[in-house]
Amino acid sequence: MTVLMFFVIYFGSVVLLCSYNFITCGNFWRTGYSALNRKWFFFYSLIIESIVLVVLPQVRYLFNEPYINSMLGTILFVLVLIVCNMGTQYIGIKRLVDIGITNPKWYLGINFLLLGSILLPGEIKSIIVHSVNMVVLVMPSQTIKNNK
């Protein structure tokens, strides 16, 4: 059940991100994001990732709770996680464009690994999360491209 939930959340958030791009600029994928206010990047990212990465492992336990044991509760819970993960993808892509990477589609693969690492044993999950965190920590030392 958790694996199914993982795929629903990941692909749902990719569809939501593409829909947002289509509504705002007419294309499903774009690289012309305006520069993100970098001083708030880690704050936004921390909030959204904490919701996704802290709540998702509890999915199997939450199904025993009365408020999510219904079909409507489950659907609402999954929709909240989809929106949160879409926000993570949007912020991550904007951050990569902000440092000068022109086509950061591969970030969706990193997001897939981060979301999927919840299903892996603890040691493998730690390695994946720490390696991605190291990449994010190294990124601010790169030259910043002004996308105005």
Residue ranges and their predicted role:
Residues M1-C18, I51-N85, L113-V135:
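Membrane-helix interface segments in multi-pass membrane proteins
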Residues P104-L115:
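The cytoplasmic-loop to transmembrane-helix boundary for the fourth helix
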